[in-house]
Amino acid sequence: RVVCAEIDRFAAAAIALNAELNGVTVEVIDSDLIGRPLEGALAGIDIVLAGDVCYERPMAERVISWFRLLAAQGVEVLLGDPGRAYLPKTGLAQAACYDVPTSLDLEDREIRPTTVWRMVG
């Protein structure tokens, strides 16, 4: 079972289209799940994949706090980050690095080094 939480309706629609094109079933939940206990729709979650959530301090603090709690409960938490200022300096182990092509319309360079981190401890 794959559950995806996305509060942006355009991104949720893109997730559904991507899943359909790839022949997979994804349950899209269009609500903010940060901080919720692992029960109900979240029961049985064993891995959380998150991308680029440390772009502003309030969001990063809220998300990272919840991710640390999940990791302490045995959930594997992987976080993709392109070098944002509010990424924590501790409690992470590097899992992978990628050079991601970007658009100069959106970024200040054509390639952005991006790291996938695993929450630890």
Name each model feature, range by range:
Residues R1-G121:
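S-adenosylmethionine-dependent methyltransferases
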